[in-house]
């Protein structure tokens, strides 16, 4: 839904907003993340941990770099405070894809808030947010050949947070500051072009990827 999309300066601001507001406004006192997240997430959760406003736990990884879903459930089951789970959809270095539906269902089962850094996959991977139990996702235009300096934060319509950036009523009072109009238009056009070729591009990228994996 358009009302769930808010424009930001990029993925870093979007993830900072989601994580900080989940702690500040949604009562999350425990953050579960992984040791291989983007710095936009790891540095944000470390900052909140240092401020002593949220405890941070790191889910185990399997030998192939995938998140250990069983360990994630153990952490969720053992938590005695409201939890924020922050796990990236696609790793920007090793390319692993998180089973975002499985993680979302676990979060739903244990009443946790779920944020996924989807900067690497918006524009490259199909999303059905109506049927994906996630509270926050992020995107950045330059990841699909759009302009730098513009991104989005998706906030599920059932989530109520206060602004992270103050000083104006832009973005429906959610994010202060004059909008980057040219960046937003460029974001929309680049996303339109990326989604129009998504299946073709996925097939093209997948062919050399799996060839390399087989040969190695």
Residue ranges and their predicted role:
Residues 1-216:
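Pyridoxal 5′-phosphate
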